[in-house]
Curated annotation (Swiss-Prot):
Pfam families: HMG_box. SMART domains: HMG. Residues 320-400 are annotated as: Disordered. This is Putative upstream-binding factor 1-like protein 6. It comes from the Eukaryota. InterPro entries: HMG_box_dom (IPR009071), HMG_box_dom_sf (IPR036910), UBF1 (IPR051762).
């Protein structure tokens, strides 16, 4: 159960119970539990001597009522002893997670340029459209922000940068004045186990790569002259490609630009998403036709080199756990291919793979690039998750 649930479960009538009092109550209950507590939760609870649990000004009946309030949010398929220990852990974690940000001196979180514009104009637009849902008003405001002149946008951006600098200075002073509060909460054991497994798998893959012979072209891919460039695989990738070079996003860092593009994708209507999807599908069809025609222009030697390069890439992807790319088999000796190849003299056509090939680092990405539907729209840079992921089963290449 999340730590915040315990606090929510406490009504106003029991507000005089501090976290320290709740911990004391749970400790008293723990001390009065039977040593071999193997009974059900309800059975052990019914035999609890609440008179022995009472402490300070809290009577046994008050302790019993308080425990009933706390246990409302706890799972019941366990022994009473385990539930008491679980409740203690939740109360302690509540103290750790909230004592920093709930501190009166902690600086106020920043608002991005868009969120600042949103808050300033929300009252006006909510009155203009009283019968409209909040989500629809948000879409209108988002559209208005996009239509703002560049000069007005720059004003919001400059205000944000100025406040960001002030926030960082205040945060640095806060950490100096309260070093005991500047401690990151420990992750749960489950997160640590998952992280350890991932790290072990990554380390294993790295060791396998390092053990390959020096001649292995694992991180190299031959770029053949005239080879068609792969288009976006889906609607979101097409939208991302179009938005990446937008002038209004150039002032953002790479990470912020990725996050903003993901947010914009969530705000556009479904009809526009379908439009991008159709564009991506059309580009994929054109790419397949161009690739097929290009393969027919290759000499038998170049076709074999291209096939070997693609096969090596698929083998390496499979070793890293990714899907192997498919290569449509085109017979270079077909009638159409022969007609195109007759004009090739010795030394013409494509040069050897090693002569003009530029080295490319291939990064295999297994997760979907599409942002989650339930992504938060709070606009806080520091707490944005999103990260931008790579397309499913595809590669991103960076020329070096």
């Amino acid at each position: 159960m999340p730590a915040k649930d315990i606090k929510v479960a406490l009504p106003r009538s029991q507000g005089h119970w501090s976290n320290a009092d709740i911990l004391r109550l749970l400790e008293c209950m723990e001390n009065n539990l039977p040593y071999d507590d193997n009974g059900t939760f309800s059975s052990t609870q019914s035999h609890m001597d609440w008179g022995k649990v009472a402490f300070k000004n809290f009577s046994g009946e008050m302790c019993r009522l308080k425990w009933l309030e706390i246990s409302c949010s706890l799972r019941k398929f366990s022994t009473l002893k385990k539930l008491v220990l679980e409740a203690k852990k939740c109360v302690k974690n509540t103290n750790k997670s909230q004592k920093g940000r709930n501190h009166p001196d902690f600086p106020k979180r920043l608002l991005t340029a868009y969120i600042r514009f949103f808050k300033e104009n929300w009252p006006q637009y909510s009155q203009m459209y009283p019968g409209m849902r909040s989500q629809e008003v948000t879409k209108i405001l988002s559209k208005k922000y996009k239509e703002l002149p560049e000069q007005m946008k720059q004003k919001h951006i400059q205000d944000f940068r100025k406040e960001k600098q002030e926030f960082e200075e205040k945060l640095a002073r806060f950490r100096e004045e309260h070093p005991d509060l500047d401690q990151k909460g420990k992750k749960s054991d489950i997160c640590k186990r998952v992280q350890t497994k991932v790290q072990k798998k990554v380390q294993k893959n790295i060791e396998e790569v390092r053990s390959l012979p020096k001649t292995d072209q694992f991180f190299k891919k031959v770029k053949f002259h005239g080879e068609p460039q792969k288009p976006p695989m889906n609607g979101y990738q097409k939208f991302h490609q179009d938005s990446w070079s937008s002038k209004e996003l150039q002032h953002l860092s790479l990470r912020e630009r990725m996050v903003e593009i993901g947010r914009r994708w969530q705000r556009i209507p479904q009809s526009q998403k379908d439009h991008y999807k159709s564009q991506a599908e059309l580009l994929q069809k054109e790419y397949k036709v161009e690739l097929d025609l290009w393969l027919k222009t290759l000499s038998p030697e170049d076709y074999a080199a291209y096939k070997e390069s693609t096969y090596a890439k698929g083998k390496n992807m499979a070793m890293m756990g990714g899907p192997a790319p498919s290569l449509k088999q085109t017979d270079p000796q077909s009638s159409s291919a022969k007609g195109l190849q007759e004009g090739f003299g010795e030394g013409q056509g494509l040069q050897a793979a090693g002569t003009e090939a530029s080295q490319t680092i291939w990064v295999n990405c297994q997760v979907s690039m599409e942002p989650e539907d339930n992504r938060k729209k709070d606009g806080e840079e520091e707490e944005s998750s999103n990260s931008l992921d790579c397309s499913s089963g595809e590669d991103m290449e960076v020329d070096v």
